[in-house]
Amino acid sequence: ARETAWAARGLGARLNGETIRVSEATDLARAAVSTGNIGSLARSNRWASLGRIMARANRTRGYGDYYHYHRLAAGQIDAVIESDVNILDIAALVVIVREAGGVFTDLDGNDPGLDTTSVLAAAPGLHGELLDRMRA
């Protein structure tokens, strides 16, 4: 897809020049969830938690790379879960998603930092539930 997303703290987010916002989703049973790199998650005790999330979600996708974060920021999907990232993969995406109104943390609910290796990014109305489900 040919698209350009950008954001600046306090100035919002844009995709191809248009202002974007995350969805207002609050119900996982009606939500679309995308996963990216999940190799280490598959080898952890959280694999079952992810399975329960995916079984409950309305739709699941596996876009990967930047693309599912753009879809999240534009309100076209509702959450992204990944377990194998580094700060270079996500630094710009954190700003884009947050400026579009989303919540962007690691799988433990911490703000991204230099040592971040996982992501839970979602519409505000879903993030807390997804975080709780990943911890279960």
Sequence positions of predicted segments:
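DPxDG-like acidic metal-binding loop motif
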Residues: A1-R14
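An extended, acidic
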Residues: R21-A136
